Regions:
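Hydrophobic, aromatic-enriched alpha-helical segments typical of multi-pass transmembrane helices
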Residues: 2-273
Length: 273
């Protein structure tokens, strides 16, 4: 009687059973526009919270343009706040990316190339946000580490801290290009999708224009930039983004009748053929 020895590779190992419940849950999220919209709204709200804290509360308390001693003194006196600001900038960037990806899934059926452009613009803005956080953290180190004062002198260390926060300040202005530009494809997709009121898409596009005008004024006409900023850089962008956040959170998307569904690009091509 012969005995056949089977190698481990000959022994069939049963494949793990697919987790149908998990996949069904994922499909339900992707196929539910209202749920996707509310997720996007929640993520967008976090962008506003962390970005508002970092740029609206922390940065202005630290940075005094042209005054190295005052800037370094603010950083030293509020070192813990600066650390919170750095973390807030990083979280702002992370939630911004997740917001764009969720909106991409929600709106890519309208025009995928435009939705991709929206995500790319957000990715560029996020990269600048994170790089700015590095400069802010390094300013904290220069202002609080005595080795820098020993190497450069107190005045020199203060000047380096101011330089780093100058770079962060103007980096934030440059990031505004992409903060503004991403609202243009978002507004277009919102306008064309039928999922949102058309006025909301129009206001988002107007906000993109306002962001860019405000930025150009800051670089090309700094003497009037501070004068026009409260009228150009704040009202329309604030109305547009706050309206979008609350529409996503509260309403989600409009309920579209079956005969009003927006066809995907592939469906439009087939229909034309």
């Amino acid at each position: 009687m012969s005995t056949t020895v089977r190698s481990p590779s000959d022994i069939a190992v049963p494949a793990p059973a697919p987790n149908h419940q998990t996949r069904a849950g994922e499909r339900e999220i992707v196929n539910s526009p209202k749920r996707l919209a509310r997720i996007a709204g929640l993520l967008y709200l976090f962008v506003g919270i962390f970005g508002g804290f970092a740029e609206g509360f922390v940065d202005p308390r630290m940075y005094v343009a042209g005054d190295a001693a005052a800037t370094a003194g603010n950083v030293v006196a509020n070192a813990g706040v600066v650390r919170l600001g750095v973390v807030a900038h990083l979280l702002d960037g992370a939630f911004f990316i997740f917001t764009a990806l969720t909106l991409f899934i929600l709106l890519k059926h309208v025009q995928q190339s435009v939705a991709r452009a929206m995500v790319i613009l957000v990715a560029l803005a996020t990269g600048i946000i994170c790089l700015n956080a590095v400069f802010q953290f390094e300013a904290l180190r220069v202002a609080t580490d005595s080795s820098y004062a020993a190497a450069f002198g107190i005045a020199g260390a203060n000047a380096v801290a101011l330089l780093l926060l100058d770079i962060q300040h103007y980096g934030t202005l440059i990031a505004q290009v992409f903060f503004g530009l991403w609202l243009a494809p978002l507004g277009y997709l919102a306008y064309k999708s039928g999922l949102f009121p058309r006025w909301l898409g129009v206001v988002l596009i107007m906000a993109a224009v306002c962001y860019l005008v405000d930025l150009l004024a800051a670089f090309l006409a700094p003497d009037i930039a501070a004068t026009i900023h409260p009228f150009v850089g704040i009202p329309v962008p604030a109305i547009a983004e706050i309206s979008m956040v609350f529409y996503l959170l509260i309403i989600g998307v409009k309920t579209i009748k079956p005969d009003q569904n927006v066809a995907s690009p592939d469906e439009r091509i087939l229909a034309a053929a």
